[in-house]
Amino acid sequence: MYTIMAIKISPRTVAAPKVQEILTRYGCIIHTRIGLHEATENTCSTSSLILLNLTPSAEEEIKNLDNELNSLEDVTAKLLNL
């Protein structure tokens, strides 16, 4: 089984530091982290998407991570179990 979390951050510059702090605390349950945002030579997107591959057996920690992220005003987190 795979437990994937998608995290949308907008505006990225406002919410990203707090998201980073939360993800650092839960680092032991994060297998893979991929950050996506549009960037060109002259501009950088104000929103971003982070994809996490989480330890499926860490159900309580995943629930806490989800709750903490969704408590932030500019952040939306969704879980997907495959």
Enumerate the predicted regions with their spans.
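Long, contiguous binding/interaction regions
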Residues: 1-82
